[in-house]
């Protein structure tokens, strides 16, 4: 095998990339915009949780939340999940078919705190609860216990509002 043989596929790939560079750039920009929306939504919910935590501490002299962790799925993880579920790879599919691109894990001091916090979030006018899975009341067969809320929150950008 010569250096030329190794470079041939690379040159072919470069030609393909050059031919479709504008389209690729548009998709990259759209993906970054979508991830920015998820990051912004996480900031909105994180702020709500911090406010509730501080308010609870002020009025009850204890913390109901011991930890808040946030995460955004990586592009590779998003792609793998779309492929695994046989979902078309598109921005629209990410937005409409995946409900775990962004996530917040909240660790509470007591189980009652979880339900109190969930109720406080449900009562906020700008939060739309999409679904709830209560694995505390109904643990999984393997013993997993948790409370999952999937929600939509509005995020206000320079030119538009997004959920």
Model regions: which residues?
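Charge-rich, low-complexity segments
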Residues: 1-97
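A broad, low-specificity signal marking well-ordered, structured residues that form hydrophobic/aromatic
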Residues: 49, 104, 147
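Solvent-exposed, flexible loop/coil residues
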Residues: 82, 105, 139-140
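Short flexible coil/turn linkers enriched for glycine and charged/polar residues
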Residues: 98-100, 143
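Short cationic amphipathic helices and targeting signals
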Residues: 102-108
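Long beta-strand-rich cores associated with HINT superfamily self-processing modules
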Residues: 110-163
């Amino acid at each position: 095998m010569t250096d030329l043989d190794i470079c041939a596929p690379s040159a072919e790939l470069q030609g393909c990339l050059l031919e479709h560079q504008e389209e690729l750039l548009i998709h990259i920009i759209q993906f970054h915009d979508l991830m920015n929306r998820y990051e912004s939504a996480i900031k909105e919910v994180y702020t709500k949780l911090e406010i509730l935590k501080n308010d609870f501490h002020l009025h009850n002299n204890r913390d109901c939340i011991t930890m808040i962790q946030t995460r955004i799925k990586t592009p590779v993880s998003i792609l793998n999940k779309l492929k695994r579920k046989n979902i078309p790879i598109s921005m629209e599919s990410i937005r409409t078919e995946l409900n775990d691109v962004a996530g917040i894990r909240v660790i509470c001091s007591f189980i009652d705190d979880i339900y109190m916090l969930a109720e406080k979030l449900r009562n906020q006018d700008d939060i739309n609860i999409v679904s709830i899975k209560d694995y505390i009341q109904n643990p999984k067969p393997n013993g997993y216990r948790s409370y999952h809320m999937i929600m939509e929150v509005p995020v206000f950008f320079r030119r538009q509002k997004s959920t």
